[in-house]
From Swiss-Prot:
Annotated stretches, region: Carboxyphosphate synthetic domain: 1-456
GO cellular component terms, semicolon-separated: cytoplasm
Positions with a binding annotation for Mn(2+) 4: 926, 928
Residues at which Mg(2+) 4 binds: 926, 928
Stretch list, region Oligomerization domain: 457-614
Species: Rhizobium meliloti (strain 1021) (Ensifer meliloti)
Chain residues that bind ATP 1: 129, 222, 228-229, 261, 263, 268, 294-296, 338, 352
Lineage, opening ranks: Bacteria, Pseudomonadati, Pseudomonadota, Alphaproteobacteria, Hyphomicrobiales
SUPFAM superfamilies, per the entry: Carbamoyl phosphate synthetase, large subunit connection domain (SSF48108), Glutathione synthetase ATP-binding domain-like (SSF56059), Methylglyoxal synthase-like (SSF52335), PreATP-grasp domain (SSF52440)
Name of the protein in question: Carbamoyl phosphate synthase large chain
Comment on protein domains: The large subunit is composed of 2 ATP-grasp domains that are involved in binding the 2 ATP molecules needed for carbamoyl phosphate synthesis. The N-terminal ATP-grasp domain (referred to as the carboxyphosphate synthetic component) catalyzes the ATP-dependent phosphorylation of hydrogencarbonate to carboxyphosphate and the subsequent nucleophilic attack by ammonia to form a carbamate intermediate.
MGS-like domain mapped to chain residues: 1027-1163
């Protein structure tokens, strides 16, 4: 079936900011879809608010809207662009929910827009729990016993009543009078949303109480139309049940939850399926979760293909998954179907399905090489699978050829519980991981151990771990069983530790329900470790190769034998035990693959020597090291830089080689670089690739500055191995990190720095803190994302930091050296990585500056003014570009100081400087001579691909020459528009965690607001970040004394546009003296009714609150948590409060307009 000719333009909805449950995988799928549809000649319109994505590059779609993804804003885009079709399956849950809202609002019908890829009926049937259950029963497939709790009946009644009122007005009035009456009716309807929602929740809770009697405990609660299991969980008792149901009903846009019988401990599988209009169906990949049911699949360790199914079981599941797609009605694209299997009797039940490209689709694509998103986009416009070629095999096979793989893929999630003190590190059906790593090996053991070291959490393999409450002298088995029975990020290591401590495989299985086959595999690794400890390293190549084929890294072998990793590497090289590289080709080597998508293995065939499929070219080449698994502080922004480096180097005639291990990213797409190695980013793995590539052609160098801290840590090892590093020298990067050397540089350049000190021990830390005085900022050296960075207000806080926080940074090898000596552990760590202390500059303005330098010339690409005060991590701060309150002289001086620093460090490529301005004096906070997370934001705002320019400079071009390759040199100080970047946080995922921001980064993603007006740009940034700014209602104000004068402009604006004001005693008194009427309300500590009650009763629509001192911060924690749970916008800085007030005023005036990114740079 040829492509459709009746469609000319297609709107793609992206996924928006990176959040837990929806990450880079949708940039990957969206980018593939944009390219695939443009390739077919369609006009592509894209909406996505995330500036850090490749898909929002202005050259990818024909019209790129970096606007908030809300139904109202997307409706404006549709009205402006009039697309023929809407593709909602590439942007995760955000895109699906937005598309369904547009349909319900009548927007799609009004503008005659057809939904392609997945019909609305199919989405409803898959996402609506009741419809899905009925559909499965219709085709004879079981689902777990369940009951729905919702408020459908009273919702329908409310909607009909509202429509009746509208009809009555239309019958009675006309013209302007009718329009005014309808607007007033809608306004009243919208104001009553909170009350209606509460009624719906109460009604659904009553149904849930009845359902509990039917389903029993434990019960699994699954909210409808949510992302990554948001709001759901497992209830083991009645109080947990009602708490989780309440949370789920609140999270569900349809106020509906499914209450399901427990299938805890059952085996979990996923099938990735693609179907076309001609009913051709192929299974791309089967995926098996090592963790049993009860852990969200995004938080589970998974393998592909499924390893514990018999062929008969696989065929049953394969047929069932195809039947599910047919029944749901998915006929143009990919879907993933999740199953649970009872290991006792083989009973198979369907858990759910996603009628769209998903996180699992990205994993399946990278695991097999099959480009699911690209094929799905083409199926959506009418093609059938047999009409499309498989790119990986160079067209030797059609897309209808079902992929087969001759290796094992392991995915392990990465968590960030350390960023959220107080969060329970227990895994449930609500997703909590922030990233993932994927590894490929010829055996499960090789794949698993590669994935473990690829996580970059300090693991070298299946490392030892301490069992909580384990007693060597008594019976420790109960402690082990308890640890095994609780799903945590470390459970896999706990299984290995239980086997080391003598538990049988059967006992371990009984405690954790992980399949016995996997436990036997872990036992084989543990037994081999014991042999290595006893006998040392083998002296012959055959046995050493056998250990490497089991996935043992040089570092792990060194730990087991008491040697250094360098000694193991030397022995390995002397015995010529080296990896070979195999290709991922979708066809298990049945056809030759021209696509250089590779992984390493030490496994040898039964006959003859191992054969490498690397086919190293004779070209001049540059290697780019990626960022590894996403984590807070190091995410999609760095992947964006790596992709741009690959694009630029290809433009400049180099062979671009990418090394990365993150399955979610565009950088690990097979066509981003010329050659892709899907490998862990460790010194051992990277150096082996370099050696392989040096066998032919010329290795011009390696780029370590684009992937965040991950590749920077490898710079020293690469340099020692004679591998040229492009751009800024590692010594200059070290100078910027080394407090003593950096201080001398600033003194030489006559630049200011906050009063500071450095501590190499616990005792020295106390002395340095005493000299600087409180408040102060403390952080470990050589970290990214402000890891373990804190503002310290008192001696007791410092003591807590030293004895509670710092021990969490101590690596395993130091802990093992000083098993019962916490101070010894800390001092050993600080001896190499000291603590850095800075005086905390209160009420200072923080500024981020990005620049490019070729060692001589400097181009300042962006000066960003933070809306939060100094002391909030720059990655968590909202900021504007260009600056909005700094004068020309100040900007001139910031440019001068940036240029001086770049030249002094002899920067080749990108550099980021963070300044603080207090009382007219500029202080240098830190310098990062590498890519920063603001690079994509700056690039989108000024209209220049600065990461591409930097890559060419690093390869040897002069700055002006590299800029000229991409058009005219922009002038960031002369923009006719303003951009505001806002951070997005995962606090709702971590109950009990304080939402107060500080110097440790906690955001997972970001959005951009772009407009010619600052207030509207800020408004768009808030809407994009999910903050629904109120147009009417009550603002609650409580600020410290020093902020009372500064809060007045914001309160006057809000009061003038009709907001009521509520305030605590001191603030209410002050506002009254200034002529502003404010209703007094109690603080939480002053007795009830207090402000928290008002927030929970939906009497407050906006909060402005600042606190000072440790006790006040602690006392106001419950207030911050209440605003989060009730989704009330909350501002903690005066600049933020004023920006919000101006934004609300602009929104109320109805001034919000949408424009494509390209239009801002048209001359």
């Amino acid at each position: 079936m040829p492509k459709r000719q009746d469609i000319k333009s297609i709107l793609i909805i992206g996924a928006g900011p990176i959040v837990i449950g929806q990450a880079c995988e949708f940039d990957y799928s969206g980018t593939q879809a944009c390219k695939a549809l443009k390739e077919e000649g369609y006009r592509v319109i894209l909406v996505n608010s995330n500036p850090a994505t490749i898909m929002t590059d202005p050259g990818l779609a024909d019209a790129t809207y970096v606007e908030p993804i809300t139904p109202e804003v997307v409706a404006k885009i549709i009205a402006k662009e009039r697309p023929d079709a809407l593709l909602p399956t590439m942007g995760g849950q955000t895109a699906l929910n937005t598309a369904l809202s547009l349909r319900r609002m009548g927007v799609l019908d009004r503008y005659n827009v057809e939904m392609i890829g997945a019909k609305p009926e199919a989405i409803d049937k898959a996402e609506d729990r009741a419809l899905f259950r009925e559909a499965m029963a219709h085709i004879g497939l079981e689902t777990p016993k369940s009951r729905l709790a919702n408020a459908t009946d009273i919702k329908d009644h409310d909607r009909k009543s509202h429509e009746a009122e509208r009809s009555a007005l239309k019958a009675k009035l006309s013209g302007d009078e009718l329009d005014k009456a309808l607007d007033e009716l809608e306004n009243q309807w919208n104001l009553g949303e909170g009350d209606r929602k509460q009624r719906y929740v109460n009604h659904a809770m009553a149904i849930a109480a009845q359902a509990l009697d039917d389903v029993g405990l434990p019960a699994i609660i699954r909210p409808s139309f949510t992302l990554g299991g948001t709001g759901g969980g497992i209830a083991y008792n009645r109080s947990e049940f009602f708490e989780i149901v309440g949370s789920g009903l609140d999270a569900s846009p349809t106020t509906e939850v499914l209450i399901e019988e427990s299938v805890l401990g059952w085996k979990e599988y996923e099938m990735e399926v693609v179907r076309d209009k001609a009913d051709n169906c192929i299974i791309i990949c089967s995926i098996e979760n090592i963790d049993p049911m009860g852990v969200h699949t995004g938080d589970s360790i998974t393998v592909a293909p499924a390893l514990t199914l018999t062929d008969k079981e696989y065929q049953i599941m394969r047929n069932a998954s195809i039947a599910v797609l047919r029944e749901i009605g998915v006929e143009t694209g990919g879907s993933n179907v999740q199953f649970a299997v009872n290991p006792e009797n083989g009973r198979l039940v369907v858990i759910e399905m996603n009628p769209r490209v998903s996180r699992s689709s990205a994993l399946a694509s990278k695991a097999t090489g099959f480009p699911i998103a690209k094929i799905a986009a083409k199926l959506a416009v009418g093609y059938t699978l047999d009409e499309l070629e498989n790119d990986i095999t160079g067209g030797a096979t059609p897309a209808s050829f079902e992929p087969s793989i001759d290796y094992v893929v392991t995915k392990i999630p990465r968590f960030a519980f350390e960023k959220f003190p107080g969060a329970e590190p227990t895994l449930t059906t609500a997703m909590k991981s922030v990233g993932e790593v994927m590894a490929i090996g010829r055996t499960f053991a090789e794949s698993l151990q590669k994935a473990l070291r690829g996580l970059e959490t300090g693991l070298t393999g299946l490392d030892e771990i301490e069992v909580p409450d384990f007693d060597d002298n008594g019976d420790g088995r109960n402690a082990i069983r308890a640890a095994l029975g609780t799903p945590t990020p470390d459970r896999l290591r706990m299984v290995a530790q239980a086997l080391r401590l003598g538990m049988s495989e059967a006992e371990v299985h009984e405690a954790c329900k992980i399949d016995p086959w996997f436990i036997a595999q872990f036992k084989a690794i543990v037994d081999m470790e014991a042999r290595i400890r006893e006998h040392g390293l083998p002296a012959d190549a055959e046995n050493l190769r056998m250990l490497k084929a089991m996935g043992f890294s040089d570092a792990r072998l060194a730990t087991l034998t008491g040697k250094r990793p360098k000694e193991v590497a030397e022995l390995r090289n002397a015995l010529n035990v080296r990896p070979v590289y195999k290709r991922i080709d979708t066809c298990a080597a049945e056809f030759a693959s021209p696509t250089a998508y590779m992984y390493s293995t030490y496994e040898t065939p039964f006959v003859g020597a191992a054969r490498s499929e690397a086919q190293v070219s004779d070209r001049k080449k540059v290697v780019i090291l990626g960022g590894g698994p996403n984590r807070i502080g190091q995410g999609i922004e760095f992947d964006y830089c790596c992709c741009h480096a690959a694009f630029a180097l290809k433009d400049a005639g180099y062979e671009a080689i990418m090394i990365n291990c993150n399955p979610e990213t565009v950088s690990t797409d097979y066509d981003t670089s010329d050659r892709l190695y899907f490998e862990p980013l460790t010194a051992e793995d990277v150096i082996e690739i370099m050696r392989a590539e040096q066998e032919n052609g010329t290795l011009h160098g390696v780029i370590v500055q684009f992937g965040g801290q991950t590749p920077l840590k490898l710079a020293e090892a690469l340099e020692k191995n004679g591998i040229p590093i492009l751009g800024t020298a590692p010594d200059a990067i070290d100078l910027a990190e080394d407090r003593d050397r950096f201080q001398k540089l600033l003194m030489k350049l006559d630049l200011n720095q906050p009063n500071n000190g450095i501590a190499y021990s616990v005792e020295q830390a106390r002395l340095v803190a005493g000299e600087i005085g409180f408040p102060l900022v403390v952080r470990p050296s050589y970290v990214l994302g402000g890891r373990a960075m804190q503002i310290i207000h008192s001696e007791s806080m410092l003591q807590s930091y030293l004895l509670d926080t710092v021990p969490g940074l101590v690596p395993e090898d130091i802990k093992q050296r000083y098993p019962n000596d916490k101070t010894g552990q800390i001092n050993t760590l600080l001896g190499k990585n000291p603590l850095l202390f800075d005086s905390y500059l209160t009420n200072a303005i923080e500024v981020d500056v990005d620049c490019l330098c070729d060692g001589k010339d400097v181009f300042v690409s962006g000066i960003m003014e933070h809306i939060e005060e100094a002391g909030i991590h720059s990655g968590d701060s909202a900021c504007s570009l260009p600056v909005h309150s700094l004068g020309t002289d100040m900007v001139d001086e910031l440019e001068r100081q940036t240029g001086a620093l770049a030249r002094a460090l002899n920067v080749g490529g990108l550099m980021n400087v963070q300044f603080a301005i207090k009382d007219g004096t500029i202080y240098v906070l830190e310098v990062n001579p590498r890519a920063s997370r603001t690079v994509p934001f700056v690039a989108k705002t000024i209209g220049a691909p600065i990461a591409k320019i930097a890559a060419r400079v690093m390869a040897g071009e002069m700055l002006d020459e590299a800029i000229a390759a991409y058009g005219k040199k922009p002038n960031p100080r002369n923009l006719k528009h303003i951009a505001v970047k806002e951070a997005v946080f995962p606090f709702a995922r971590f109950p009990g965690v304080d939402t107060l921001l500080g110097p440790e980064m906690r955001s997972t993603g970001e959005v951009i607001g772009l407009d010619t007006d600052y207030a509207l740009a800020f408004a768009k940034s808030q809407l994009g970040a999910g903050v629904d700014l109120p147009r009417d209602g009550t603002v609650f104000v409580s600020v410290r004394d020093e902020d009372k004068e500064r809060v007045l402009p914001a309160i006057r604006i809000l009061s003038d546009i009709g907001f009521k004001v509520m305030a605590t005693g001191g603030t209410a008194r002050f506002l009254g003296e200034q002529g502003i009427v404010a209703t007094k309300i109690n603080k939480v500590l002053e007795g009830r009714p207090h402000v928290e009650d008002a927030i929970r009763n939906r009497q407050v629509q906006l909060v402005i609150n600042t606190t000072d001192g440790n006790k006040a911060i602690s006392d106001s924690k419950s207030l911050r948590r209440a605003t989060l749970m009730q989704k009330v916008p909350y501002y903690t800085t005066m600049a933020g409060a004023e920006a919000a007030a101006l934004a609300i005023k602009a929104l109320k005036a109805g001034n919000l307009e949408v424009r494509p990114l390209q239009s801002y740079f048209e001359t």
